[in-house]
Structure formats: C-alpha cells, structure tokens
Amino acid sequence: EINILNLNNDNNEIPNYGWPQASYGRHYFDNNDDNDVRYKLSPLKDSHSKYGFVEPLKYFTPSVAISQIIGVDKNFYNTDGNALFVGTMGTAKKLKEGMLSLYFFELKDDKIIKDQFIPIKSRVRDIIYNKENNYLIMYLETNNALAVLKKS
C-alpha cells in the first residue's frame, strides 16, 4: 500500500492507516489456511474506511513487493502536482504482472491523476533521484546492474 501521511488535517489527529487490522494484502505467514489460529488472532479487513481507517492512496493485489518510493522534482515530468516513482521487486517463487517494474504516479491534492507502468524485468532494489541532472539511478538486483532513467 502507498499512504500519504497528512498531518495537516482539520481535526489535528494523526491518521491511522489500519495496519495490522486493515490491509488489502495478506499476512506474511499466509499459507492459505483460513483455519490457521493466527488469522483468528489478527484478521485483516479489506476495507479501511468502514473500520475508521484512512484508505490507501494506492494498493497492489497481489503485492508487487514495493522496494522504494521516491519523490521527484516537478521538472522531471513537467507536472503541476507531485510525482512519485515506486520500485518493485516481486518474489522469486511467483512472479506476477507488475513485479520487476517501476511505477510513476502524478499526484494532485493527494490523489493520483496519472499513473504509468514501466517494465524493468529486474528487481528494482534502490532508486536515487539526481535532481541537478534530472534523472533516476536504479540498482537492479536481478542483473546486478545500474540503470539510468532520464526524461527524453
């Protein structure tokens, strides 16, 4: 899940995003056995708002194994709002659509107004934004390589 921490809300409360009571994901110990006592001790609710929690900005089901979320300068994509890149790693056992990739999100008023999926075909372990030269440097774990993403 991606959450925007907003401490400037109307009632001066610290927002609660629900973990570990609410999540669109599954437990780390997930063995697909709903009779597992751990599910009874800490069930996950699919809805956040229904239980008084803040809904996430974005969630991925199944999980894409987010490695890093990094904000970039408005000049990187000529946006009016904020822009984020999200690196993903996936798992060695079950690769699914959206894993081993990079996501771009343009935000305005804490809402996604544009998103882009960029297939990388390698685990994106780390991302650095070079603001001075306006490009991203990524460490790709699967290939043991560095990659540069620059606006064309």
Residue ranges and their predicted role:
Residues 128-152:
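Blade-level signature of beta-propeller repeat domains, shared across WD40, Kelch, NHL, RCC1
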Residues 1-113:
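Beta-propeller domain segments
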Residues 33-35, 118, 143, 152:
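Generic preference for flexible, low-structure residues
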Residues 110-131:
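Conserved blade-ending motifs and adjacent loop-strand segments that build the rim/top face
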Residues 100-103, 122-125, 144:
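A generic structural signal for well-ordered alpha-helical surface patches
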